[in-house]
């Protein structure tokens, strides 16, 4: 399974245009999570696709959309965990093995300072 992360402008119709590219290529999206992100007037889209070749075939078409700021295909072979953590002053992205991410989250005392927004 391939995980694709997009940073887009938070505007009406963006999801329709992004998903239209998957429809044109006949690519089935297994899961999708969308939400506002740490940057003002922007949103993050995280989706999963079963076939890496199909995921690679649609990336350039998605990058060409005006509303898309960034597209990243997450390398699953590294078995990394990604989490967006929201603190009072902003958001940070923690990357590492599952054990490393767990250790960082536990050290940060999330119940006091951090709210987990999305985790893959």
Residue ranges of each PLM-predicted region?
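Long, contiguous binding/interaction regions
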Residues: 1-3, 7-42, 50-120
